[in-house]
Amino acid sequence: MKYRFFSIFLLSQVLYSQQFRNINNTSDLGVYNNNNGVAVADYDKDGDLDLFIVSAHSNDNEDSWSRLLENTNNGNFIDVTENSGISQSLDHEINLINYDIYGNQIYDVIEQGDRLSASWGDFNNDGFPDLFLGNAVQSELYKNNGNGTFSNVTDSAGFEIYCENCYITGALWLDYDLDGYLDIFLADYNSNSPNKLYRNLGNETFELIDISSSSENANSFSAISIYANDDMYPDIYIANDFDLNNQLLINQNGEGFIEMAVDFGVEDPYDGMGLATCDFNNDLKLDFYVTNIKENSLYAKDIFDAEFTYTNYSEQVNVYDTG
């Protein structure tokens, strides 16, 4: 019998909180504006994290165009959008259209193709993260070619190039059916356009899955993947705006979903915006935080609760009102 021995040294020390400083200007990030979000990944596999900044495009202001920024590993980023192959779709004249963003019959003037969200995910399992862009009226899937360039495969992959009512503010990659390939859920902020789930077929194409019976049309802003009932199948939690209940889609072993937000105590009708997962209480259970126009919420499960319901700890831990 072989034995392995480990020496353990216990050290005591005083710990101080970390200090942060704004390096926007020194990192060449301060010039970009009208930004709707950022997606982080090591797209070129060089060991450091790169950025895709998704922006509301203004034809007469190049600083408002979406950008792919490569991390130079010295505290700076360089704009590689043009050489990446993504620029062909981003740096072009965008038409102004009248659009009912909120589904309330009031039309706003927007730029067709406004970038609203970005999400990295390796949909073809080649080790290189691919990029999905959620836009107004259209969306885009870019395949990472592994050499610093991308190819627009939106059409060939089975996604709508043009969708009349869509306003995709969130894109969530997850393997909902556990077949080893990332699927994608799209949160749509237009209540006249449903949220969508696309199943990855494993051959670089996707099929649209009907989830209309479990996810009603709403002003959905974002979505995260959690394990609400502690099985192996990921569930989907959706933040909805305008006093609508948030939605919790419980995965039915990869065969469909059932909406159960009220059952789990996470309906949270406070004008949902952002979502983030964490384990704030170190119980090895996935908790999540909801940022709202109204009060924020921090949900965690009671490990002794056989019903898997959640408790909102936001007031208890002082993250209820973050200003």
Could you say what each language-model-derived stretch is?
Residues M1, S17-G323:
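Acidic, glycine/proline-rich Ca2+-coordinating loop motifs
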Residues Y3-Q13:
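Sec-dependent N-terminal signal peptides
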